[in-house]
């Protein structure tokens, strides 16, 4: 397994349109997720001299001017770009950062068909759930002395020593609505005319949810390669 260079991790922001299937020339059906990555605007280029590290800050989407704070409005006005719905930055090498300027755009051509990518999004919220659904616990006995304790997790701590519940104990609670990353997804098709990426398989989040697409950080080396 090889690891991508930091300078090769420049990606795109987008929105999950939904899922569909396409057919190959051989007639095979391929499930894909359609990602809209249009109009990625560069809001800031960070350098080692001014910021201590190299990065490219990008915004996606459109937002009303009345919904933008004054500090953010001034920051975007300096770059000469329209306010977006999300703002992210990608750590890159100094050489890559030098290729971009504030006010420019990132094309969908950053990615190519057959390339491996990591897609990050916010998973669908499931509300309050128990330990069986949330943590894959097993239930208690259905009968033989069990009374009203069929789906309880059981003991959560010990008695006098240590006398407390350890942090991170798996218990009931809110499930989903967290940042998730699905790695090593194949790009099946790049639609430059409509600024769309068709990625094989599912990606985190609901329809119209925001996603971040980056080149895969864990690229599996082909068998037989040195």
UniProtKB/Swiss-Prot annotation:
Q: InterPro entries, from UniProt?
A: Ribosomal_uL3, Ribosomal_uL3_bac/org-type, Ribosomal_uL3_CS, Transl_B-barrel_sf
Which BP terms from GO are recorded?
translation
Q: Name one Pfam family in it.
A: Ribosomal_L3
Q: Supply one GO molecular-function term.
A: rRNA binding
Q: Which UniProt keywords apply?
A: Methylation, Ribonucleoprotein, Ribosomal protein, RNA-binding, rRNA-binding
GO CC, any one term: cytosolic large ribosomal subunit
What SUPFAM superfamilies does its record include? Answer: Translation proteins
SUBUNIT field: Part of the 50S ribosomal subunit. Forms a cluster with proteins L14 and L19.
What does this gene product do?
One of the primary rRNA binding proteins, it binds directly near the 3'-end of the 23S rRNA, where it nucleates assembly of the 50S subunit.
| Name of the featured protein | Large ribosomal subunit protein uL3
Q: Which organism is it from?
A: Methylibium petroleiphilum (strain ATCC BAA-1232 / LMG 22953 / PM1)
**What is the phylogenetic placement of the source species in the record?**
Bacteria, Pseudomonadati, Pseudomonadota, Betaproteobacteria, Burkholderiales
